[in-house]
């Protein structure tokens, strides 16, 4: 899904993305780099409900699952019959997220704030409704908002596909 719909070369050409499915305890079931669910849950102090989808760009909020702010990490709790059964997650490298240089990869950065907008774990979807004001705030801090929106939509589509497949397997 992501390769067919993403716009940025980081995802389409360099395959700079990572899908993962984890069980209820947060242990990786499918993926290659390990699970960051525990770190994510420690950094997020709100509720986890059906219809939520979370976003972070903060490498410190997910046990280093992403290495810099250009990586947008999405996490989807998967519910079946009102009960949390698993998690789907994916990160994708965005082309530009603000910061002091185009591409948001300053080689001379002395602190993370020079890389671009740092987003702590937050609900970007509540009850399956996009929090458009939050996404627009993030996109307004990019030199490539159209690409980032398209790539974000590709990641969301991947989360929904993973959710559907996990629920099918659980039936």
Predicted segments — roles?
Residues 1-23, 27-29, 148, 152-156, ...:
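Intrinsically disordered, low-complexity terminal regulatory regions
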Residues 1-14, 45, 55, 59-63, ...:
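Short, basic/aromatic recognition patches
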Residues 11-14, 45-48, 66-69, 81, ...:
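Solvent-exposed alpha-helices and their adjacent loops that cap or buttress functional pockets
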Residues 24-31, 38-63:
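Regulatory sensory and allosteric helical modules in signal-transduction proteins
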Residues 31-34, 64-70, 89-90, 97-103:
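Short acidic, glycine/serine/threonine-rich loops at helix termini
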Residues 71-81, 89:
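A short, hydrophobic, proline-anchored segment that marks a local hinge/packing element in signaling
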Residues 84-141:
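Gly/Pro-rich active-site capping loops and adjacent beta-alpha segments
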Residues 118-171:
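N-terminal leader/propeptide and maturation segments of large enzyme subunits in energy/redox metabolism
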């Amino acid at each position: 899904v992501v390769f067919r719909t993403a716009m940025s070369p980081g995802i389409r050409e360099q395959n700079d993305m990572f899908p993962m499915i984890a069980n209820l305890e947060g242990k990786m079931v499918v993926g290659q780099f390990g699970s960051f669910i525990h770190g994510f849950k420690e950094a997020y102090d709100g509720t986890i409900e059906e219809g939520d989808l979370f976003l972070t760009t903060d490498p410190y909020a997910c046990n280093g699952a992403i290495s810099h702010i250009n990586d947008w990490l999405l996490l989807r709790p998967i519910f079946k019959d009102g009960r949390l059964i698993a998690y789907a997650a994916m990160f994708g490298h965005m082309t530009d997220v603000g910061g002091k240089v185009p591409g948001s990869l300053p080689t001379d950065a002395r602190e993370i704030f020079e890389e671009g907008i740092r987003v702590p774990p937050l609900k970007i979807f509540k009850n399956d409704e996009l929090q458009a004001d939050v996404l627009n705030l993030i996109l307004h801090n990019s030199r490539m908002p159209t690409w980032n929106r398209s790539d974000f939509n590709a990641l969301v589509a991947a989360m929904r596909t993973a959710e559907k497949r996990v629920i099918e397997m659980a039936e």
